[in-house]
């Protein structure tokens, strides 16, 4: 059986922490910032740790090699 390949789109969008959690960029920051409050824009900076159920899907299907 051949090796499982990591999805190339997933390796650009997700990272794994040392404990195996999945880190992704914040959603909702591409356009339309003028209608958002300053608090919303500020809170959407940086990255976000995905919930356990979503992280399990990403690790199993898209990042088999970590």
Curated annotation (Swiss-Prot):
GO terms for biological process: translation. One of its GO terms (molecular function) is structural constituent of ribosome. GO terms for cellular component: cytosolic large ribosomal subunit. InterPro entries: Ribosomal_bL35 (IPR001706), Ribosomal_bL35-like (IPR021137), Ribosomal_bL35_CS (IPR018265), Ribosomal_bL35_sf (IPR037229). PROSITE patterns: RIBOSOMAL_L35 (PS00936). It comes from the Bacteria. Keywords: Ribonucleoprotein, Ribosomal protein. NCBIfam families: rpmI_bact (TIGR00001). This is Large ribosomal subunit protein bL35. It comes from Azorhizobium caulinodans (strain ATCC 43989 / DSM 5975 / JCM 20966 / LMG 6465 / NBRC 14845 / NCIMB 13405 / ORS 571).
């Amino acid at each position: 059986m051949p090796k499982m390949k990591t999805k190339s789109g997933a390796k650009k969008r997700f990272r794994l922490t040392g404990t195996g959690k999945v880190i992704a960029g914040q959603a909702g920051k591409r356009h339309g910032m003028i209608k958002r409050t300053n608090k919303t824009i500020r809170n959407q900076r940086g990255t976000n740790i995905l919930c356990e159920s979503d992280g399990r899907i990403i690790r199993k299907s898209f990042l088999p090699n970590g």
